[in-house]
Swiss-Prot record:
Present with 41 molecules/cell in log phase SD medium. PANTHER family: DISCO-INTERACTING PROTEIN 2, DISCO-INTERACTING PROTEIN 2 DIP2 -RELATED. Residues 5-101 form the DMAP1-binding domain. Keywords: Glycoprotein, Ligase, Membrane, Mitochondrion, Phosphoprotein, Stress response, Transmembrane, Transmembrane helix, Unfolded protein response, Vacuole. It is found in: Vacuole membrane; Mitochondrion membrane. The gene is CRM2. It comes from Saccharomyces cerevisiae (strain ATCC 204508 / S288c) (Baker's yeast). It comes from the Eukaryota. This is Homeostatic regulator of DAG. InterPro entries: AMP-bd_C, AMP-bd_C_sf, AMP-dep_synth/lig_dom, ANL_N_sf, Dip2-like_dom, DMAP1-bd, Mug62_dom. One of its GO terms (molecular function) is ligase activity. Gene3D superfamilies: 3.30.300.30, N-terminal domain of ligase-like. PROSITE patterns: DMAP1_BIND. Disruption phenotype: Causes sensitivity to unfolded protein response-inducing agents such as tunicamycin. Results in a significant 23% increase in the total DAG level compared with a moderate depletion in triacylglycerol (TAG) level. Leads to a 19-fold accumulation of C36:0 and 8-fold accumulation of C36:1 chain-length DAG subspecies. GO terms for cellular component: cellular bud neck; cytosol; mitochondrial membrane; vacuolar membrane; vacuole-mitochondrion membrane contact site.
Length: 1648
């Protein structure tokens, strides 16, 4: 047995060999198994040596067989240690390929057809070499058919006629003949004759001409569908006057869209009907239901409105025979793009005439013998009169006659042909029997309708056939010659019903021939490009199957179609009833219209697809739409597309298997180039289809096509896209339609569909929405429409979202009608909701099953919306799939229910550790990670790369310490560190600098005096001596109290920040009392504040409460506060109002020395340095709100020394105190630092400053204030008020006397210029985006990022690190989120990765003096090396002395062993093992950076980067995520989201969300967006999404909690657990991490 380990092996392989040897020795492996696996490892190493840049697999080869590689780059301008290189042989492979770094996971392109036409590429594909002889066989373009100069117009020179000339002819020869009839929804008929039509049009033209408009000016035609006669008059009036018409109406466009059309076209004239004008006058706002006066709108004020209903006729036109100019542009129709954008289709005269001529030829070619009572041509001459009245055809139009196909083939085609058009309201078709009776009544010859309209008519008829008959009369359809049905795809079921169950049953002669689906391009003005014709001239069209030449139907293989191949089957056609599952029935539109060139193209490459392959249909002709109004770039792309011959010839030359085949393909391409030159312009139709026997078959629009990975079902009924799993014996991987060699070819023929690696293979398939819709609607009776689209995630994922319209879902109005306040009815409503939810669950489960059975697809989620709420395509009843997607992304879908299915996502794409039962900080993974980082670091050493024996070691993450043993007063050079307490320093200041200013109240005196309720004493410029007298006054009050206090008694000082507050603190310290400073209670949350106060009083056994006059007045004079205060008054000890104490000049502190020693002196043996004197209570964060910090005189002095020495505080720079005056750094700025440094301290009450900030801001501007401590919220408030004041001062400067004003009294934009150090505290990661937004919002105020200093503080240390005076802007690091999950710090270049594929952080600065920070693994207690993150440990003199835990339920103090241990932690390493550290519980890392300061000097800094707290990180499948990153992603999803909290509870990843106040938050849609973004950006699946009401926490809890969710995570989660939060809605998404672990372990076990 060979147990040797070759030394040349990489470290990871050496480790794996060791594991193998140990497994064999432990008898976990047989001899044969050991030898086999050893050989595999060594062979793999040899292969990797030949390909040195191939990454190795995961260390756990049984669990992870996927390739994994990262590219990294520096993201910031700073120079950092070069620790980021490719991990080529890294043994630390925690994550599977599902978590590939952002650099290697390109996003899916926005084009919906990307990678969908794989089989059109020549022979490409066969990466595995199974199809060696694939040859590129491009389809031959269909050329125009020359139909000859057939006289189609009975002697008219149609090719040169204009519509106004034709109208004039009809007026002259058919003046009394009815031109058109309009039937509204109520059945009222309105008609007009040719003479009235012409004369009224002339009247409109006259009105336009006299308005001094220019030729081709844009005229808005504002008419509804029922105003078809008035609309036709206005349109023809525009034609006659040479103007360009632009149809608009509220039935088609919103007001915003109409305003946009007016601006784009620069229209100044509107022709409008009376009905539409009344709509304008009675327009109401949808938000506040107030009347909107559009006439006063700036846009409409410049427009002239002319009502055409009352204009009358222009009789002068009878006398003259005018000559008409043929306008180039007839009208501009604004259609909507798939994404909802307006695009103006320019409809030109020659396009319209060609459409009419072509339709005339086609209808004439289809003339049948039973048409003999009609004339030979459908077009009637206009230059002479035909007496026979029955020769006219009756055209019954149910399409919108004011636009698109209804306008072209209805109104204008009727004018061109001289027949009778009857325009009916579309609502008539929805009534049973309505359409049939009108057809029979008017004996309609030609029906013009929409496929979905006709479908509803037939369904109504089949449900109740008697509705189409009456007792006196039988419906007879023998009059129908053609049924022209506008559509883009043919629903074969509808065709079957229309022909055989409607037309034929009701007497239509030759129904299959009459029914003619017409391929119309609604997005391009409604022109038609194909319909079944009998024009012949098909000699140049290719024949694929002569047996199917006369057939209009095809049966094609469904599985081949998924790979874009078209395989027809005659057998399936014969046995159509039994071949439904395997073959798809398609119906053709017919041949292209005669004058166009048509080809099928791969839109990705602009190359011809292989013959009988699906692609985008392109057409070329001089008589089709060729312009969008003022959209040049779009025009270039859409209308001037060219075939990429160079690419095709390149394939022929280089990609063919043999020279003979290459030559054959080249010759074929030469032929195509001759018949279709390279400079031919094509129009992209956005239709996906193919050509067979010269006929067009359309499968869908490009927007209705989506891609899916082929899935196989596992034995446990989960799904995977890994087709290699089929080799394990699972035969469901091969669909029925493909077996054996045929299946292999089907899979391998695509280059882009097959994705193969050493352990993975995927095949991408194309699916078409129409087929999905047909299946679901046919099998689920409550579903009526379906939309489906892919999420814009990484390109290989293809996550599908499906939206269904169902009758189970209620609209918003129906839901509101069901609301009630009656208890019984509410219970009943709740029961009904539960039943509805059960039905919804059953519905979505049924859809999931059906989609798998028939299409082998599994959507990621299904949303259920009410019926008729999804947007429809322009001028169609079909769903606008892309618009649905856009509404989904904008959270505008009224989703009532959503259900997810994630099994294949978990198995195929969810990032997870190979060791998903281990923490990334475990001893095992930490060891592997350090070995990997060490190997990387060693490989970048030049000596190592050159073969030298260098073995450099990675540095440990330690800040180093700058220890200051002493601190000296800047003036007297006295050692401040020799004093034992702050009181001794105070006395020294009083004796040496008694007349210098010590403290000052910053409150505006005027503001104080104006308020009768505030009796606080305001002390301005108090000297040291005067301050001592104030302290002495308070000492007298305490000493002489009738209820005496004794040494160590706890007392509470509760007041605003003021001079008297500081004096009271000092007085109590003199008395050796335990001082508990607390902020004043707030009226808004008085109940919670008083509860907290009573809890502290009872826990500490507080003997006295000292308050100022302002708080005393609030408690006693405010009715609301006093009512609440009386409930707790009995629990509160004596309250002393120290503001009432009078200051006497005769008093000094020294006078009380003996009294204090007698009454408050310590007992013998008491260690003063170990006795707490101050308790800091900080309730800002609920996690630590009940943990109170205790400080001794010694610890207070040490903290003051650190602040002074770090900030280099001097006596000549005044201090401003405004924030957090009762604890931490705020307490030190208020009470200690002024005394310690000798600087004057100005104390401001935050509430007063926010009321009137002028004095505070003027002080900052004019005084030499260098350092300022502000909370982020306070900074925002100050900037907001400063901005308002500066704007006010600017307005005042306009006054003439402003020059005389004192500039020191006015606020300038550089108000913060002198403040070099604005300290913003953060307990974890700095909120950099908030600060950036604040600075951007108030950019008028001069404030740079270098002035703002992040302070990293902890509950037990107010100053662990800071950025003060570094003289460099914050250092940006862009971290790879995929590496961060694994515990590794790896930078990326933000320019190289898409937004969201990095985590941006900034440093928290360097450590202060006398502080040592190390980064330690919290599980192993070993120091972390450079390149990984760990827990931040701090050894500092500023650490808290001790703590108390104040239990709110038991009202007592106690110590927690875990927290106690936290104060005296030691590392297990040999380095620094003698030091005791404070464990912060925060994760971060230290990085050495080189950067250039403002003086141009290069400085090296050990910067601390804080990532987040351990309790705010979560582990999912072995990977670590920071909830702050997840929550930021959720908040960025939609502006509706106000607050968000993510936590892990009971194995579930839970997200609590509070939406901003909005009329109708759409929570089902929002949930899906949240789940999608978390999955996309972080690779996590949310399990439960809960929406709380705006006032979501019950009255028993603080409403303020909801305002600051991030600071009150524990309280909110506890309230949720206790069901005290009112839930708006709750969505279950997945089943938790345990299910994912089960699926993964079961899957990997079977794949071993």
């Amino acid at each position: 047995m060979d147990f040797s380990i070759p030394p040349t092996l990489p470290l990871d392989l050496q480790s794996r060999l060791n594991e193998l040897i140990q497994d064999y020795k432990d008898e976990n492996l047989t001899r044969k198994g050991y030898e086999t696996k050893r050989k595999q490892l060594l062979d793999k190493f040899e292969i990797s040596q030949m390909r040195p840049y191939t990454p190795l697999r995961s260390p756990n080869s049984r669990k992870s067989k996927h390739l994994h590689r990262r590219n990294t780059s520096l993201a910031s301008s700073i120079t950092s240690l070069p620790n980021s290189i490719d991990r080529r042989h890294s043994i630390y492979r925690v994550t599977t390929i599902n978590s590939t770094s952002a650099n290697n996971t390109p996003r899916r392109r926005s084009k919906r057809y990307t990678a969908s036409l794989q089989s059109s590429l020549p022979g490409s594909s066969d990466e595995n070499g199974s199809v060696k002889d694939a040859v590129y066989n491009p389809m031959i373009p269909l050329l125009p058919r020359h139909t000859g100069a057939e006289n189609t117009s009975s002697g008219d020179s149609a090719m040169t006629d204009s519509l106004p000339l034709i109208l004039r002819g009809r007026f002259e020869h058919y003046d009394g003949q009815t031109a058109m009839i309009s039937i509204n929804s109520k059945g009222k008929e309105t008609f007009i004759t040719w003479d009235k039509l012409y004369l009224k049009a002339e009247r409109v033209a006259h009105e336009l001409n006299k308005s001094h408009l220019y030729k081709m000016d844009k005229i808005l035609l504002w008419y509804n569908k029922n105003d078809v006669i008035e609309f036709t008059i206005a349109l023809l009036g525009c034609f006659i006057s040479g103007m360009a018409a632009v149809p608009v109406s509220f039935e088609t466009y919103s007001l915003r869209e109409i305003l946009e059309i007016i601006k784009v076209t620069n229209s100044k004239f509107v022709l409008i009907s009376n009905a539409c004008h009344r709509q304008l006058d009675n327009l109401y706002s949808s938000s506040n239901h107030s009347k909107v006066k559009l006439v006063k709108n700036d846009v409409f004020q410049q427009i002239k409105f002319v009502k055409t209903d009352d204009l009358g006729t222009y009789t002068k036109a009878k006398k003259t025979s005018p000559t008409f100019d043929i306008p180039n542009i007839s009208y501009i129709e604004f259609t909507r793009t798939p994404l909802g954008r307006l695009s103006g289709v320019v409809m030109k005269h020659n396009i319209l005439i060609n459409q009419f001529e072509t339709m005339t030829k086609i209808l004439n070619s289809r003339s049948m013998p039973h048409w003999k009572q009609k004339s030979q041509s459908i077009r009637k001459p206009f230059h002479k009169k035909i007496m026979a009245t029955n020769s006219r055809f009756v055209i019954l139009n149910s399409l919108d006659p004011t636009r698109s196909t209804g306008l072209i083939m209805g109104v204008l085609f009727n004018l061109f042909t001289g027949n009778l058009m009857i325009s009916i309201d579309s609502s008539i078709l929805q009534r049973p029997g309505g359409y049939e009776n009108i057809i029979d009544k008017f004996r309609a010859d030609i029906l013009l309708n929409d496929q979905l309209q006709l479908k509803q008519v037939v369904i109504n008829y089949l449900e109740n056939p008697e509705s189409a008959f009456s007792k006196k009369h039988k419906i007879d359809f023998s009059c129908i010659k053609s049924c022209l049905t506008s559509c883009t795809t043919i629903d074969t079921d509808v065709s079957e019903m229309v022909v055989h169950k409607w037309l034929k049953n009701l007497g239509c002669i030759d129904a299959p021939f009459c029914y003619s689906p017409m391929l119309t391009l609604l997005d391009f003005g409604g022109i038609f490009i194909s319909i079944r014709d009998q024009l012949g001239n098909l000699e140049n069209f290719p024949i694929h199957n002569s047996k199917l030449r006369l057939q209009n139907e095809l049966f094609i293989n469904r599985e081949k179609l998924k790979l874009n191949e078209v395989e027809c089957s005659i057998t399936a056609m014969i046995n159509s009833s039994s071949s439904f599952k395997d073959y798809l029935k398609l119906e053709t539109f017919g041949f292209p219209i005669p004058d166009i060139t048509l080809c099928v193209v791969n839109p990705d490459t602009n190359t011809l697809v292989q013959d009988l392959t699906v692609g985008e249909i392109w057409i070329s002709s001089n008589h089709i739409t060729d312009e969008f109004y003022q959209m040049d770039k779009v025009n270039e792309f859409v209308f001037k597309a060219k075939l990429n011959y160079s690419e095709m010839f390149s394939w022929a030359k280089y990609e063919m298997p043999t020279n003979e085949k290459s030559q054959a393909v080249t010759e074929q391409l030469d032929t195509i180039l001759n018949i279709c030159p390279a400079n031919t312009y094509f129009m992209r139709t956005k239709l996906m289809g193919f050509v067979h026997n010269g006929k067009i078959y359309v499968l869908s629009l490009i927007e209705d096509m989506f891609l899916q990975n082929r899935l196989i079902r596992l034995p446990n009924w989960a799904h995977t896209s890994n087709l290699l799993y089929a080799k394990k014996g699972n035969q469901s991987a091969q669909p029925k339609g493909n077996t054996g060699a045929e299946s292999t070819k089907a899979i391998d023929i695509s280059s882009l569909s097959g994705e193969t690696s050493s352990g993975y293979k995927r095949v991408v398939e194309s699916h078409y929405l129409q087929q999905i819709t047909e299946t679901v609607v046919r099998t689920v009776n409550t579903v009526f429409e379906v939309a489906a689209f892919e999420l814009q995630h990484h390109k290989e994922e293809h996550f599908l979202v499906m939206v269904v319209e169902s009758s189970l879902a209620k609209t918003e109005e129906e839901s509101k009608n069901g609301e009630t306040t009656d208890t019984t009815l509410m219970k009943f409503a709740e029961t009904q909701r539960n039943k509805l939810e059960t039905k919804m669950n059953d519905l979505t489960d049924q859809i999931f099953r059906i989609l798998w059975i028939f299409h082998k697809i599994q959507p990621m989620c299904i949303l259920v919306v009410p019926r008729d709420t999804l947007p429809r395509r322009y001028c169609s009843l079909e769903l606008a799939n892309s618009t649905v997607e856009k509404k989904f992304l904008n959270n505008d879908l009224s989703a009532q229910f959503v259900k997810f299915q994630f099994d294949n996502v978990i198995l195929d794409f969810l990032p997870h550790s190979a060791y998903y039962n281990e923490s990334i900080l475990s001893e095992h993974l930490s060891k592997l990670r350090k070995m990997a980082l060490q190997e990387e670091y060693a490989m970048i050493e030049p000596a190592y790369r050159n073969g030298g024996p260098v073995k450099p070691k990675l540095a440990l993450q330690c800040s180093g310490v700058d220890y200051r043993d002493e601190s000296v007063d800047t003036r007297s050079h006295t050692k401040l560190t020799d004093f034992k307490s702050i009181l001794e320093i105070l006395e020294w200041r009083i004796s040496n600098y008694g007349n210098e200013t010590a403290f000052s109240d910053g409150t505006n005196t005027n503001l104080v005096n104006s308020s009768a309720s505030n009796d606080n004493n305001v002390h301005k410029k108090v000297s040291w001596a005067s301050f001592g007298k104030i302290v002495a006054g308070f000492l007298k009050k305490i000493v002489g109290s009738k209820i005496p206090l004794k040494h160590g008694d706890p007392i509470i000082i509760m007041c605003e920040n003021s001079v008297e507050y500081v004096a009271m603190i000092m007085a109590c310290l003199y008395c050796n009392l335990l001082v508990i400073p607390l902020p004043s209670v707030k009226e808004s949350v008085i109940e919670e504040d008083l509860k907290g106060l009573v809890n502290i009083i009872q826990s500490y056994k507080v003997k006295r409460v000292f308050v100022d006059a302002k708080l005393h007045s609030l408690l006693n004079d405010n009715n609301v506060v006093n009512k609440c205060f009386k409930k707790y008054k009995s629990l509160i000890p004596k309250i002393t109002v120290f503001s009432k104490v009078k200051t006497k000049n005769a008093l000094t502190v020294s006078m009380f020395k003996n009294v204090l020693k007698q009454k408050f002196g310590a007992k013998p043996g008491t260690r003063i340095g170990m006795t707490p004197c101050v308790v800091w209570v900080n309730t800002e964060y609920d996690v630590t709100s009940n943990i109170h910090v205790t400080m001794t005189h010694s610890s207070l002095l040490n903290a003051s020394k650190i602040v002074k020495e770090t900030l280099q505080l001097r006596n000549n720079s005044p201090l401003f105190s405004i924030c957090s005056h009762t604890s931490g750094l705020g307490f030190m700025f208020s009470c200690l630092l002024g005394i310690y440094t000798g600087a004057s301290t100005c104390l401001f009450s935050l509430t007063d400053v926010l009321t009137d900030p002028k004095e505070f801001l003027i002080g900052l501007q004019n005084l030499n204030v260098k350092d300022l401590y502000l909370k982020l919220e306070t900074l925002y408030a100050l900037l907001d008020r400063a901005s308002s004041l500066i704007e006010g001062f600017k307005n005042k400067k306009e006054n003439i006397n402003s020059a005389k004003n004192n500039t020191s009294g006015s606020l300038r934009e550089d108000v913060f210029k002198g403040v070099r150090n604005i300290m913003i505290p953060f307990p974890n990661r700095p909120r950099i985006y908030t600060i950036e937004n604040i600075l951007k919002r108030y950019s008028t105020i001069s404030l740079s990022c270098t002035q703002i200093s992040y302070v990293y503080q902890h509950h037990f240390n107010p100053l662990i690190s800071l950025r003060s005076y570094l003289d460099i802007p914050p250092v940006d690091l862009y971290l790879d989120p995929f590496s961060l999950r694994e515990g590794i710090i790896r930078e990326v270049n933000p320019n190289d990765v898409s937004a969201g594929n990095y985590i941006k952080i900034q440093d928290s600065g360097v450590v202060p003096v006398c502080t040592d920070v190390s980064v330690v693994n919290p599980e192993t207690l070993l120091p972390c090396v450079d390149g990984e993150f760990g827990e931040i440990w701090c050894c500092s003199e500023a650490n808290a002395f001790d703590y108390f835990v104040c239990n709110s339920s038991k009202n007592k103090l106690y110590k927690d062993p875990f927290i106690t241990e936290q104060f005296k932690s030691k590392m297990k390493s040999e380095v620094n093992n003698t030091l005791s550290y404070l464990r912060t519980g925060d994760l971060g890392f230290i990085k050495n950076v080189s950067c250039t300061n403002s003086q141009g000097e290069v400085v090296n800094l050990n910067l601390l980067f804080v990532l987040g707290s351990i309790h705010e990180s979560i582990e999912i499948l072995g990977l670590t995520h920071f909830v702050s990153d997840l929550e930021r992603t959720v908040k960025d999803v939609h502006s509706d989201i106000g607050s968000c909290l993510i936590a892990k509870a009971g194995g579930l990843l839970v997200c609590l969300i509070r939406c901003k106040e909005r009329h109708n938050p759409i929570l089902g849609n929002l949930t899906t967006l949240i789940v999608s973004e978390l999955l996309n950006k972080h690779g996590v699946i949310l399990d439960l999404c809960t929406f709380v009401r705006t006032k979501g926490i019950s009255p028993k809890n603080s409403s303020m909690i909801m305002e600051v969710w991030a600071k009150n995570r524990a309280s909110i989660m506890q309230a949720w657990f206790d069901q005290k939060i009112q839930i708006e809605a709750q969505f279950g998404i997945n089943y938790g991490e345990n299910i994912s672990i089960y699926l993964l372990s079961d899957y990997e076990k079977d794949n071993i």
